[in-house]
């Protein structure tokens, strides 16, 4: 089928659908919901059999859904209606939630239901649930609906007006989730912050200054006078509740153009007087050992790795190499493996160019340490999405194991033609081949694990229980005890020596950084403009041609909607 994805942004769900539908042979193009007239134009250009709207903030124009079937993904179970479905679900602590695929008609969220999925809720940020459970269920539901439409099934009947499942909820506002520090329990505080995490952030005050709170975690073995800030750890601040405390990892001031940054950095002067309490529930980096398997786990907010994060992870990596293990797992968090350098920290720096340079060198140091590890096998375990330098950092390991639910974005160019580093010019061609490496980095499209496996970017695809910590350790132990381990390690050492003799790692780094220096310090400001627009969420004025295939002028005879092959 020829399918148009109509979305407010090319977010994680839209990317997953783009990948999964193309993988199944559909002709997919994307249009960002910029204006009703632009939507009409995109329908005229692409001539879709079906429009799918994974993420909208307004209704599809009447004349569009009347002329072509439009499916809307609603982040709630059948009968739920309103613009803040997931916010309310997280805030109210429901045990189960769902996602519904319905056909657009004259009433918002009230059209015929083609499919739906349910999932158990966990105590987590709204953005994390959206990126994981909701996205996985939405993809399954959309694919079911598409298959039914392809099979010629008639549209289901809409819910009857008196159906008891119908519940219309308005926006979830600040007043609905304001924290009462003198009465709210730790779990209540977490639900309130989690319900606004991602966007818009929960407004509260710290040190008598209003900020938006993000990245909340339950604190362990810490308590104090409710409402007071009592400790710090790895950039987070602990604030006491009536029955414990919560860690606040990131905050954002209310002033225009403020940035979301580590809480202890925003309030550095105040935090200077607070005790450090490591091991109390906030730990972006952890190391555990299981016999011959070491596991270095890391989880940075939104996958962004600041200079200090890279240096801390490198220190932990070097410490892990001192341990007598045969296999080392580098396990990323449930939301992201890594998205590379920390653009918000760079934007906040006195010199964005200088901080960009420090950050890229810090992540390069980490990548090089992994590449040069020859006394054991290293595995990158990707359980959440990865982008840009984060993808190439994972390739520094001997093997890459990835969840079947993730999306990879192995390219940099969307960030103002950024060239990239992390030794990608060595690592990517070594796995995918030179021609594929060029195509991947130029196409700038999201990649699913099926394609990544075909290109040898991913070595093993994992799902379900195989992603649990115990299963990962078991897989690592099997690798460590394999009869061919010694031979494999020797082959690794020989290949590294041969590669170094052919072209030293330093040469790759020098060449990459020469190009990056132009991005950071050169006359072309594209990187700095793109970074600013990304960090401040400046709305796009048009859909990038890399995903809007219907807007590319094509040679005669070439299908209008065919996206660039990846």
Curated annotation (Swiss-Prot):
GO biological process, one term: biosynthetic process
InterPro entries named in the record: ClpP/crotonase-like_dom_sf (IPR029045), Enoyl-CoA_hydra/iso (IPR001753), Formyl_trans_C (IPR005793), Formyl_transf_N (IPR002376), Formyl_transf_N_sf (IPR036477), Formyl_transferase-like_C_sf (IPR011034), HoxX-like (IPR047180), NiFe-hyd_mat_HypX/HoxX (IPR009188)
Domain of life: Bacteria
A molecular function GO annotation: catalytic activity
One family name in Pfam for this protein: Formyl_trans_N
Function: Involved in the post-translational processing of the hydrogenase large subunit.
Protein known as: Hydrogenase maturation factor HoxX
Species per Swiss-Prot/TrEMBL record: Bradyrhizobium diazoefficiens (strain JCM 10833 / BCRC 13528 / IAM 13628 / NBRC 14792 / USDA 110)
């Amino acid at each position: 089928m020829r399918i148009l994805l109509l979305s407010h942004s090319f977010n994680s769900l839209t990317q997953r659908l783009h990948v999964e539908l193309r993988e199944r042979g559909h002709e997919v193009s994307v249009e960002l919901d910029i204006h009703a007239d632009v939507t009409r134009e995109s329908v005229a250009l692409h001539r879709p059999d079906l429009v799918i709207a994974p993420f909208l903030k307004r209704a599809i124009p009447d004349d569009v859904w009347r002329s072509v079937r439009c499916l809307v993904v609603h982040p709630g179970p059948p009968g739920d209606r309103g613009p803040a479905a997931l916010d309310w679900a997280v805030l109210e602590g429901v045990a189960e939630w769902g996602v519904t695929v319905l056909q657009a008609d004259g009433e918002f969220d009230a059209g015929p239901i083609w499919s739906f999925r349910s999932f158990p809720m966990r105590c987590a940020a709204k953005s994390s649930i959206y990126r994981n459970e909701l996205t996985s269920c939405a993809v399954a539901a959309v694919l079911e609906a598409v298959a039914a439409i392809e099979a010629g099934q008639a549209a289901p009947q809409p819910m009857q007006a008196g159906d008891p499942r119908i519940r219309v909820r308005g926006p979830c506002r600040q007043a609905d989730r304001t924290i009462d520090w003198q009465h709210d329990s730790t779990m209540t505080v977490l639900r309130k912050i989690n319900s606004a995490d991602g966007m818009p952030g929960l407004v509260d005050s710290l040190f008598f200054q209003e900020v938006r709170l993000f990245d909340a975690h339950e604190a362990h073995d810490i308590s104090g006078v409710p409402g007071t800030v009592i400790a710090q750890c790895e950039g987070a601040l602990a604030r006491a509740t009536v029955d414990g405390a919560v860690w606040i990892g990131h905050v954002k001031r209310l002033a225009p153009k403020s940035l979301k940054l580590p809480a202890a950095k925003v309030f550095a002067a105040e935090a200077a007087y607070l005790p450090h309490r490591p091991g109390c529930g906030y730990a972006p980096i952890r190391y555990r050992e299981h016999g011959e398997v070491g596991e270095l786990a890391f989880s940075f907010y939104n996958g962004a790795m600041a200079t200090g994060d890279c240096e801390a992870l490198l220190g932990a990596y070097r410490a892990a190499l001192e341990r007598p293990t045969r296999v080392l797992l580098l396990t990323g968090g449930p939301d992201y493996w890594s998205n590379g350098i920390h653009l918000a920290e760079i934007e906040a720096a006195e010199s964005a160019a200088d901080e960009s340079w420090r950050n890229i060198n810090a992540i390069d140091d980490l990548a090089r340490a992994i590449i040069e590890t020859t006394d054991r096998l290293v595995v990158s375990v990707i359980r959440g999405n990865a982008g840009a330098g984060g993808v190439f950092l994972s390739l520094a390991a001997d093997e890459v194991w990835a969840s079947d639910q993730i999306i990879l974005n192995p390219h940099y160019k969307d960030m103002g033609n950024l060239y990239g580093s992390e030794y990608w010019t060595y690592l990517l061609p070594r796995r995918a081949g030179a021609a594929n490496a060029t195509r991947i980095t130029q196409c700038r499209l999201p990649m699913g694990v099926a394609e990544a496996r075909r290109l040898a970017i991913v070595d093993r695809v994992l799902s379900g229980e195989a992603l649990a910590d115990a299963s990962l350790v078991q897989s690592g132990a099997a690798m460590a005890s394999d009869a061919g381990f010694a031979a494999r390690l020797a082959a690794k050492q020989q290949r590294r020596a041969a590669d170094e003799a052919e072209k030293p790692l330093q040469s790759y780094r020098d060449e990459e950084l020469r190009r990056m220096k132009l991005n950071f310090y050169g006359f072309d400001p594209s990187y700095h403009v793109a970074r600013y627009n990304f960090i401040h969420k400046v709305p796009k004025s048009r859909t990038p041609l890399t995903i809007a295939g219907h807007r590319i002028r094509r040679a005669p005879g070439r299908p209008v909607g065919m996206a660039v092959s990846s």
